[in-house]
Amino acid sequence: MPRNSGAGYGCPHGDPSMLDSRETPQESRQDMIVRTTQEKLKTSSLTDRQPLSKESLNHALELSVPEKVNNAQWDAPEEALWTTRADGRVRLRIDPSCPQLPYTVHRMFYEALDKYGDLIALGFKRQDKWEHISYSQYYLLARRAAKGFLKLGLKQAHSVAILGFNSPEWFFSAVGTVFAGGIVTGIYTTSSPEACQYIAYDCCANVIMVDTQKQLEKILKIWKQLPHLKAVVIYKEPPPNKMANVYTMEEFMELGNEVPEEALDAIIDTQQPNQCCVLVYTSGTTGNPKGVMLSQDNITWTARYGSQAGDIRPAEVQQEVVVSYLPLSHIAAQIYDLWTGIQWGAQVCFAEPDALKGSLVNTLREVEPTSHMGVPRVWEKIMERIQEVAAQSGFIRRKMLLWAMSVTLEQNLTCPGSDLKPFTTRLADYLVLAKVRQALGFAKCQKNFYGAAPMMAETQHFFLGLNIRLYAGYGLSETSGPHFMSSPYNYRLYSSGKLVPGCRVKLVNQDAEGIGEICLWGRTIFMGYLNMEDKTCEAIDEEGWLHTGDAGRLDADGFLYITGRLKELIITAGGENVPPVPIEEAVKMELPIISNAMLIGDQRKFLSMLLTLKCTLDPDTSDQTDNLTEQAMEFCQRVGSRATTVSEIIEKKDEAVYQAIEEGIRRVNMNAAARPYHIQKWAILERDFSISGGELGPTMKLKRLTVLEKYKGIIDSFYQEQKM
């Protein structure tokens, strides 16, 4: 895809000055929105139809950065480090390690507009063709959306909830919400009506944006239970029929014409960096989800310094190109795709809604990103797909790939920081690996990130064998995303990187190996949980440190290694402390047929394990089918089984497969630190874990409490049979 295509969002010639007042028959709704926005601003401020340069844009909007921002002054009388009120303010954590003065989201965008106004900001597909929005157009659309929200009655510190897949509308609605003094609140598209109701009620949503009729139906079911909700806007599909207070995107954007630019500017001028602008709801694995309040300083600081720690570059040096596909309701995707994009003038291209069902690689090939982020499960799926293709390839091709990956992995493990590559490694890359990366869409990708969950060593080794280094980040919703980051200049295998500027860490209650609870401090730390004072006080101690509940250690160079979750730590009936993740990963490494493994044993006499097998996905629903993957069938054939489905293995209790799994677990037990770490019983489940099944969260993280409850009968049977 061209890097600097002139085709803008609603701007067929790439120049906003070319927009004509006549609506052509081919004009789309997006074209009309941009055109009418331009006309409205021009007629109010310009006497002639001059090109919309940076200077004329300033004149047209009659904008200036407020004096208090120009003078680097801001009002911060608050002393408390936390609040639970949406309209509350906090004392920002400015100290000698991060003395830079704070600024607002609007200032961040305004400065980006000055530098990157003519660059492509957003890319999206319409009728199988890529179209683009420049930063100037993006800013205008965000202002238009802000005025639309004000017209609909958005109150200060109330929310606009967005329920839809990643899109330009998601972006400029989010930015417009902040401009209008509201709070952006993402809702996962997989959420039930009840989950939507809880979040929309808790955040006092005045407006809810939905992308499809399916999502609209959820809101219509719960509208009567939402006293603050004034309107719903559907932006990808038309509503099934005309309904009161339900607007199409065109109608919503048209409402903005009735609000003067000066009214919006007055609101922008009053905004402070220590006010809430984003709400991120946790997945709620233990009760109702918590609303994580993030300030404007949280967002602008992390977008700038968190991304710098990952070597994300400003467009003056190299315009970063990224693909947006992970749920924007999650802070990792939102900070990486949306806010960091604005900070550095990146080009963000939107994947199709079925990205995780198989179309992501097609988008990657077309876009050719310069940096890419995926949760571990996404990288695992890419790995499994490559393995399946390799298994179906001819003998020579398969052997060439194995050879190339073997010599490359060895080089990357023995000399991880060296730019001097042996001839065999360079030859392997030229003949084989470069072609694989190109087929994946990673030919120009310099930085590949992962986070939100631990990654298996097998997956990291696999991609190192392809000459794709995966850079880890560590953080939480409560740290606005990354608090630690890896990069080409700060990398150590298996670590989560080093501290982001303006951040601090301490480990409490360390054991003999230096492992303790990770506690964090810095400009990334959240304001508090909305309406939850008790939970906020549990998370933030009297000195202002955030207690993460994660266990880890630091090496001599400051690299962080996560060892597990304190709450996930299994304490057996005999008093042994057993971290489950290393044992689960060891089982998956030993048995390539295993998709998910969950260790059980808290307050039990011995350890047991639930296993799921690798199976294919339904292309329409993305749910797991009964059919084994190519890799799983290859495992079966290798151990002497002809099984092609999970049900065959379970119903017939396939002796070859069960024996192979038993032997694999025996090998894991042999490498265990002590007998209490041995897995004594296990069972294969009929279906793999999934988001729709409830066992996985939106970022594919295992929801252990849900699994314990859902499979309680099987788990209890492990221990009922152990009679004294």
Swiss-Prot record:
Modified residues (Phosphoserine): 53, 56
Intracellular or extracellular location(s): Cytoplasm; Cytoplasmic vesicle; Microsome; Endoplasmic reticulum
Family annotation (CDD domains): ACSBG_like (cd05933)
InterPro entries: AMP-binding_CS (IPR020845), AMP-dep_synth/lig_dom (IPR000873), ANL_N_sf (IPR042099)
Keyword set, alphabetical order: ATP-binding, Cell membrane, Cytoplasm, Cytoplasmic vesicle, Endoplasmic reticulum, Fatty acid metabolism, Ligase, Lipid metabolism, Membrane, Microsome, Nucleotide-binding, Phosphoprotein
GO annotation (BP), single: very long-chain fatty acid metabolic process
Pfam families listed in its UniProt record: AMP-binding (PF00501), AMP-binding_C_3 (PF23562)
Region feature (Disordered): 1-30
Tissue expression profile of the protein: Expressed primarily in brain. Expressed at lower level in testis and adrenal gland. Present in all regions of brain except pituitary.
Chemical reaction(s) catalysed: a long-chain fatty acid + ATP + CoA = a long-chain fatty acyl-CoA + AMP + diphosphate; (E)-hexadec-2-enoate + ATP + CoA = (2E)-hexadecenoyl-CoA + AMP + diphosphate; hexadecanoate + ATP + CoA = hexadecanoyl-CoA + AMP + diphosphate
Chain residues that bind ATP: 282-290, 472-477, 550, 565, 701
Superkingdom to which the source organism belongs: Eukaryota
GO molecular function, one term: long-chain fatty acid-CoA ligase activity
Phosphotyrosine PTM sites in chain numbering: 658
The keyword DNA-binding appears for this protein: no
EC number of the protein: 6.2.1.3
GO CC entries: cytoplasm; cytoplasmic vesicle; cytosol; endoplasmic reticulum; plasma membrane
Record's function text: Catalyzes the conversion of fatty acids such as long-chain and very long-chain fatty acids to their active form acyl-CoAs for both synthesis of cellular lipids, and degradation via beta-oxidation. Can activate diverse saturated, monosaturated and polyunsaturated fatty acids.
Protein name: Long-chain-fatty-acid--CoA ligase ACSBG1
Designated gene of the protein: ACSBG1
